[in-house]
Amino acid sequence: MTRGIDLIEEVARHYGYDKFPPRLPPAKQPAHRLPHAEAQDRLRERIVALGYQEIVEIPIVDTQRNELFRPENLAPAVIGNPLAEDASVMRSTGTVSMLRAIEWNLNHGQRNLRLFEIGKTYELRDGAPIETQVLTLGATGMAQEKTIYEAAREFGFADLKGDLDRIGELAGGFAWQSGGPQWLAGSRAAQIALAAKSPDSANLGTTGQLAKRIADIYKFRQDVFVAELKLEPLVTGVEAANAARRFKPLPRFPAVERDFSLVLADGVAFAQVDAAIRSLQIAELESIEAADLFRGGQIPAGKFSLMIRVKFQSAEATFTDAQLNDISARIVAALQEKLGATLRAI
């Protein structure tokens, strides 16, 4: 015996190890939550409430699959001694892992999937590995199975966009712009930013339907939709929106809706219409919705008709016709000036 612990060991051995109660030693450091843990919990709760299941994927992926989604400006983080050919690089995007999970489930008979993952992506920058946390969503299959009450309906881009809007409500809302990376279908792809302007809000992520050439590589026989968002600016937006939240009393006066049937040039997005109206900073503005879209008939070629429904709510008094007419005139003037819109009817 050379140390005090040796004597303790001998005493314990003679006394009998089986006689010591099975207790863990007390923790010497207080437990603490990681940064943004509460905001991440709120995101998880919202996504699960929307019907998604959380997955945890291995971040080591196949090089060829990773190259399908790797942005050209990101250098891949290649593993020096890979255990297998299909596990030779750290993933550059969360999408490649999400599609692997969807592929496995489809091959095993699971046709209706709503999945999400919070995990890291990897790249090399100046020879050093960089890790970025992302939120990835994937969905495919039926949005509504056939019942005696409802007809069957496949999950579509509008369903995913609606789910993302619900998630974005936690961060003050999302701003949308059409288009996305080449692995998404051009007509069903969008870029997402936080509605609240900040240095990190401009390029939050992308979403859309998987392009046909990518779906063919995976041998998908049904439409697959994905979304990938940077987690750091998203949770920061959740925290900022939560801090700015204030109590709002229930309205005492009725809300009023006005419909505007507009004729717009092809290529004008609803997001532009929404932004043009909101730029007027009408205090009583409650919501703007796209109610109907029409092409053909008396609508000239190269144009389309969009009916929007605008809701107003005053906390001080019931609207008069004069007030509504004044607000409506301002909206029409703004749409004419900024988007070249013409009004069919109010």
Which functions belong to the PLM regions below?
Residues 82, 93, 119-121, 138-140, ...:
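Structured loops at beta-to-helix junctions and adjacent beta-edge loops in soluble globular domains
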